[in-house]
Structures are given as C-alpha cells and as structure tokens.
Amino acid sequence: MNRMMLFLILSIVVISGADALPKFATRQGAKCQSCHINPTGKGMRSTFGSTYGREELTMTTYKETTDIEEYSPMLNDFFTVGMDYRTLFYYREQNSTSSFFQMQGDLYLDLRLNKKFRIYFDKGLYSGFEVFGLAKVLPLEGYIKLGNFIPSYGLKMDDHNLLIRSGAFFPINPAIASYPGGLGFGQGAEDTGLELGFSPAFLTINVGVFNGKKGGLAGTGGTKNKAIVVRADANVQTDLVNFNVGGSVYNQPNAGSPGKTQIFGGFGVISLNNNLTLQGEYDYLTTYNSVLNKEVTGSILYGELNYLLTSGVDLKLGYEFYDPNLDRKDGSISRFTVGAEIFPLTGVEVRPLYRINQEKPTELNNNELHIMFHFYL
C-alpha cells in the first residue's frame, strides 16, 4: 500500500508542477475508438489514428523529403489494410546473451459490409488471431462486437512485457515461478465472446461475456460459467490538462481449468501541455494456486512518465511492482524502465529501453536492454 501512496503522490506532484497508446489519445483529448477500428483500442488505425501517426508523431527532419503525398491504406471505400511489424534486439545481463526476436508481424483487414457493419481480421506470425463482426447500431454511440478478441481490461498497452499485460518474456524471479507472470491480457489472450460498448458524452463503457478460455478450437468446450469483463472510463479535456480515469473488472468463476480468476483495478492517464504524460494502473489479481492448493491474491502496480522532448522523440521513465501473494512473503518483483520512443520517419519507430529488475528475497543480476524496431501502416 505504501507503493500505491507513492504513486498517488507522484501524480499530484506532476499535476501541480508540470508545464494509443493511451498517452497519445489523452494528449489529443480523444478516446481509443477515435484512433483504432477496434472500439477498445489496439490493432488497425482509423483514419484519425493514421493521420495522427503521420502528421504528429514523426520527426520533421526528413518528413518533407520522404513522405508520400496523399497516402492512404484504403484500397477503396469499403476495404482497408494495415500492419504492425516489430523486431526486438535484446541483451540479458544474467547470462550475457543477446538475440534478435521477431515479436510481431500482424496483418489487419477491415471490410465494410454497409454503413453500420464491418468485419475485422488480425492475424499475426504465431498462434492467436482476432476476428470479429462490429455493428454500430446501439444508442449512445454504442456497438455490438462478436467474435474472437482480447477482452477489454485496463490500459491497453502495446508492450506485452509489462506486468499489467502478459508479463516479462523471460521469468524474472524464480521464487514466484508458481504464480501468474502478469495479468494475462497480452498477445495470445484472445477469447471468444460478445461485447457491448457505449460512449455517451465523455464516458465509455464496455461489457463483455466470454468463454473464459483461449480462443480457437481449444476454447470451444462448453462450460456452465462464463467470464464477465466490465470496463468504464471518463475522458475530460481542458485548455491545460487532459485526463482519463477509469476501472476494470474481470471475473472468471470456472472452478476447473484454468481455475478461478478475478481481477479488478483502476487506471488513469493525465497529460499536461500536450507533452508531459503520466499513466498508471493498479490491480488486484486472485487465482487458484495449484502448488499451495488454494486461492491467492496479489497486486500489480504500473506507472510511466513520458515527456515529448521534440517532435518524434518521447522520453520514458517507468516503474512496476508485483507481489503475487499478499498473505505470504514468497517474493516480489520491482522493475524500473528508462528509454525513449523515437519516430525518425513516417511509419518507423525505434524504442530503446533499459530495464532494471529487482527481486526479493534473492537479488539477481538480470537487467535487460531492449531495442525494438517497429514499422507500421
């Protein structure tokens, strides 16, 4: 709880003294559905999101000589394509090894059947996919989404190594290996179900019902219980400050495999002068632990400060903390991240990150250097 108070104090300091990713949407005073075809964010960018990425994110140095005039990913009035391609170079201090890893190669297809209904498809290099029908036919700018997709929970960050998403790709602390590595909402977390969404004024509300299992053939087995996901947030824009605040609940009561899972938490993003952004999330996670043979509750804290140094250069400072069992001192993880997001050319991002990992009860020398190369359409 002391870490939670520290995070709140940091938020107040930033608000008082400071002159997409969720941070990009909040900087513009926009909602996730303004930037993406998927109303809950992630994946193919909308016309607004694509224009923002081309006009606002990129360095101005080579923009005039490299940009394509009147560029559009729309093949015609009803068919649009998109793509995200990420290659990661990483270095691990623990064993002094390095490697290249093809993180992502997602192809997006958006097919409009009529003015109200569209089919969306997202297929990556590895297992997992998203495909759904989206009908914008409900009142209050509402929609119905049916298919296989990642449930809408918390901040939908693109870094799946964050503890509030899938968790670290390489296990950080062996002492807590029997606990979940993160919340589990990263790549490969697709589930089949139905989602309803509403966006009255400055509010956004999403309610989903899912099988509670991984999508595809593996998730078709019938169950009596279904997973319920609820997410709501408020988006407020002023002349000086834009902020977004909300909360999420995920409840999967299935007593069998994969076991009971209950997650709830709050999140927020605040942007000042369109260049200083603080975002954070705090969650409680309850799961069944097969080693202890009982349910356990842990907590995850995430905070990140971003500063737009100049057009195309975003500096990052992040902190994460994970205690998987609040009733026992089995171990914990603290992680500090320093880095930047650099957009040298339109559709090109380079993201160097250095992560300092701290473990309890035994400290390991396992810091990491990540350099991610991202090409997007």
What are the language-model segments listed below?
Residues 29-39:
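The canonical Cys-X-X-Cys-His
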